[in-house]
């Protein structure tokens, strides 16, 4: 038995799977308009199966979340998510007009509120986990957590702190 994504066998060595990123927690492959995050065997402090399942049911605009779960030999090994393309010709966020930048941040703030209402902590936000291609995205949920602490407002403050 090998990799299974949403009850379908997949072979990450096929040509249709292209590795597009490599990080501390794993590799990201591109296939058919999706990104597939595959955890390293030695990855620590990563999202667990229960949290990943929970996140697949939440809809956001610019904070990318898992949409299908990846298993290897019946063990949770990663997930697929929306592929956000980086365009090297695209303007950089520093050159973004102020009103456009404000709108991008407002959309992320709306997503932060949605996730805070669902008790999700945005953990591990850093520059490598953001993409700007005319739109601003947070792209790596591998360290997000479910926290049942305090009020939604307290969690939203923590999440805003992670983002800013």
Give residue spans per PLM region:
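Protein kinase-like catalytic core scaffold
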Residues: 34, 62, 79, 137-140, ...
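C-lobe/activation-segment region of protein kinase-like
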Residues: 97-98, 117, 132-164
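ATP-binding glycine-rich phosphate-binding loop
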Residues: 1-45, 58-61
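Regulatory alphaC helix of protein kinase catalytic domains
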Residues: 52-53
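Conserved structural core of kinase catalytic domains
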Residues: 62-104
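Conserved protein kinase catalytic core
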Residues: 43, 88, 146-148
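Conserved hydrophobic "DFG−1" position in protein kinase catalytic cores
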Residues: 30, 38, 83, 131-132
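Conserved kinase catalytic-core helix
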Residues: 91-132, 136
